[in-house]
Amino acid sequence: MDIKAYKMDGLGNDFVIIDQRTKNIEFSKKQIIKICDRNFIGCDQLIIIKKNRELDAGLEFYNSDGSVSGACGNGTRCVAYLLSKENNKKEITAWTSSAI
């Protein structure tokens, strides 16, 4: 199974970003903890990019303990960079559980 994933750093925070706009894969809390484990891939947060009909993307954030986070400014900036390069856009609009 092919999964498009990135490891990025934003002002000292590091993220694993998984693009699920074309293929939806649900991760369990245990899998999220494993991905974030510094002895495996390792990151402060896991970010999932989801397809959104009205906006450029929907974003889900997970802390390294597997808990849900509403949003993360540094992580959102990393995703915005990816999406702006992909779509050649200067502005990106994304949904999070905290806000648009």
Predicted features and spans:
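A glycine-rich beta-to-alpha transition motif near the start of alpha/beta enzyme domains, typified by
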Residues: 1-100
